[in-house]
Amino acid sequence: MGMRPTARMPKLTRRSRVLILIALGVIALLLAGPRLIDAYVDWLWFGELGYRSVFTTVLVTRFLVFLVAGVLVGGIVFAGLALAYRTRPVFVPNNDNDPVARYRTVVLARLRLFGIGIPAAIGLLAGIVAQSYWVRIQLFLHGGDFGITDPQFGKDLGFYAFELPFYRLLLSYLFVAIFLAFVANVVSHYLFGGIRLTGRSGALSRSARIQLVSLVGVLVLLKAVAYWLDRYELLSHTRGGKPFTGAGYTDINAVLPAKLILMAIAVICAAAVFSAIVLRDLRIPAIGLVLLLLSSLIVGAAWPMIVEQISVKPNAAQKESEYISRSITATRQAYGLTSNVVTYRNYTGDGEATAQQVAADRATTSNIRLLDPTIVSPAFTQFQQGKNFYYFPDQLSIDRYFDRNNNLRDYVVAARELNPDRLIDNQRDWINRHTVYTHGNGFIASPANTVRGIANDPNQNGGYPEFLVNVVGANGTVVSDGPAPLDQPRIYYGPVISNTPADYAIVGKTGADREYDYETSADTKNYTYTGSGGVSVGSWISRTVFAAKFAERNFLFSNVIGSNSKILFNRDPAQRVEAVAPWLTTDSAVYPAIVNKRMVWILDGYTTLDNYPYSQLTSLSSATADSNEVAFNRLLPDKQVSYIRNSVKATVDAYDGTVTLYQQDEQDPVLKAWMQVFPGTVKPKGDISPELAAHLRYPEDLFKVQRMLLAKYHVNDPVTFFSTSDFWDVPLDPNPTASSYQPPYYIVAKNIAKNDNSASYQLISAMNRFKRDYLAAYISASSDPATYGKITVLTIPGQVNGPKLANNAITTDPAVSQDLGVIGRDNQNRIRWGNLLTLPVGQGGLLYVEPVYASPGASDAASSYPRLIRVAMMYNDKIGYGPTVRDALNGLFGPGAGDAATGIQPTEGGAPANVPPNNAPSPEALPGTPPSPPTAVPPAPEASVTLSPAKAAAMKEIQSAIGAARDAQKKGDFAAYGAALQRLDDAITKFNNTQ
């Protein structure tokens, strides 16, 4: 049967072609239109911020990389196709059984489409992928030296950081391009008769043989280059079963020689492949390729495995000793843990302390932090929210200021931001949402070492934070009662206000003031934004662009937008910093501060590498995970790093959105490279004002990475390192509701870096022994300007209780558990344990402090905010417990120990400070010490006063409760005493409410 005639492609009419072109144009517009709009909006946004050079540099770099990579890969593939076509056989036998004849006809009919379209498509894809590597290329072009050489090849580390990644990228693209050219060449020769799979002779034309052999030879040469580069990558290699990163004994003595041998074999094989051009014998290159494959299996895989199993494993500690030492040195360099940064000191951890010694530690005892920033947010909401649309984050921040007596104190701080998601009813209307409710109002700070009033029951008036507020007052002036003066408390930029899909506000003078600002007793006062931030939307072009950007027609039709209108968008501080510095990794925490009478958001930025020779490779998400990060879902991306520097401090003005980047690490070669890529975007460290320096803090995420590494890399001896016997562990959070590691804590305490009693703002963490619950070390990182970044490690030799054991001892103490059982009222009230702080006090001792909160009911509603109810402490197996820090210290160390402790502030109702309410235990009411009976009760009526029967009965109940409390005191029965206090509280309430 004859073969069916080859079908021809149908011809399109003119109308069909026009319709297809229109359809393609519409598709292209739909695909490219949003991207063009986004690019134009970004151009406007970067220009408004003063960072347009960043936008243009990144855009031009991406375009050039796209162009070069696309032309390179597409050109090589095109060359493979073109050579195959131009050297095709003049006569191609065409019998009826030829399976490719039909395809050959189709290709010949659309030769330009296939000959240009296929390379263009491949080049397009290659360019799209390559442009994402613009960071690697810019570092190659601008990277410099580290001034440190690797211990194996003697090359400066700048080669590994900046050059080697580029060489590997270039090699990968060349390999892919040549391979695709080889495939294209094979297909073309097969299609046009250069390769025939039928018949006994002429299976491969001369031109096909030359071209294919040449391409295979180039691939083998590229493989030889890859073997050469593999040698350097061994120094940042991780292999299973090896307790360190980098080349070990097997890598240096087996894998490294194997790479050189394989490189030589690859060069020989390439020569054998090229020989087929002249010798016309394909068996020689085939033998060469088989030899290369076998060599890679025997020399590259089998031989190192034999060395590892026979020579290394039986004597691993000794064999790997030299290379472990290399890893210890490199890891300390890469993570900023060298001897000029980290100081180790011996510390007993269980030294005895007298009341006088504890009182002398005034910087510590007067600053014991009672407010847990993860717990007190509902109290901020209850007392300071004001309106339904204002909001405080669930986790607040810690910063320090000098109080009115010029004492350094730590504060729980928060900005009262506007939360668009909390708008209700007509507030959600587009005009109200984007032109009326535009900003927050106020900076709130609470001294972390005190509360207002003593509460023995969560329903009492006490135990809540003392609030220092900077806010726009009822008369329109700024009330500046906060820890520092603030000229402009309005907040247009922040992490809360931006946490919504439609993150923009339209501001500017278009008639009467429109923006909600504050309320008086008579009416609502509005405001008009006067800051420099924002992109103009006064022209119809801008209105059209933003209407398309946000898919909102009101930009075109609303009369609230005028010639002076501006749009504020991209208002998240971290995202703004990441946009203007795309080479930075930002810390998960951003905190507000008052600097030079302006409210700013402060962020930490990191420069990182993932190929620092011999340095431990670390996952940022794993290293920075703790109970707070897990609870509030703030985990960093799963990025692998082997080098990190807190190279940049960034500020974002809360009013006008100005982003300022400051150089923090003046020695970081990675930062220096980026400062050359984007000149003028990062200000020198000398531009950091003293006012800003006073609020910079050691970054939390960096500290968590460093403490995880210090758990291993504090060890100097490589044999001990290999045995892991002296490793440490990051302790788990002892709080029963936590599910991860204990977070580090910012505190003000005595200066560990200077080893004196001056007050110091520091970030601290306890460290456990490996797989044990006993303390191994105490780490403190200084945030003071004079000693910023200095890390002090107190090593603890004995068996000192770690956080878990301390928490267990406190919570299971009979007196504590009985008292909290009374307060909890059989789970009718919720008891919450605050952060467990570890504080060095006295001469070599460690004090554990854990505040206790209680809230009415079992819910987390703002109306049932937690109140500080007790303070629990532990020192050398002894428990201190009471309503105040002073009480707990006196009970733990004896009278006078708490003399320096900060007192309780008066309640809003005016109750005097440091005076327990009617049913509060006196300072002696501590475990092991019977409390004094309560005496503050309603005054007895004068003889001439006749009480109603109900009041007389209530008075008898009060007297009976007092008697029961005194009896419990004599017996030392703490549970009975607590029950008597509760009876007394109920009786007093009944007396006051009875007519």
Curated annotation (Swiss-Prot):
Where found? Cell membrane
| Membrane-topology annotation of the record | Multi-pass membrane protein
| Cellular component annotations (GO), alphabetically ordered | extracellular region; plasma membrane
Q: Where is this region: Disordered?
A: 900-948
Instruction: Write down a Pfam family by its short name.
Output: UPF0182
The membrane-spanning stretches of this chain are 18-38, 63-83, 113-133, 175-195, 210-230, 259-279, 287-307
Q: Where is the composition biased (Pro residues)?
A: 928-941
Q: Which domain of life is it from?
A: Bacteria
- UniProt xrefs under InterPro entries: UPF0182
Q: Which UniProt keywords apply?
A: Cell membrane, Membrane, Transmembrane, Transmembrane helix
The entry assigns this protein to a family as follows: Belongs to the UPF0182 family.
Q: What HAMAP family is this protein classified in?
A: UPF0182
Its protein name is: UPF0182 protein MMAR_1371
| Species, as recorded | Mycobacterium marinum (strain ATCC BAA-535 / M)
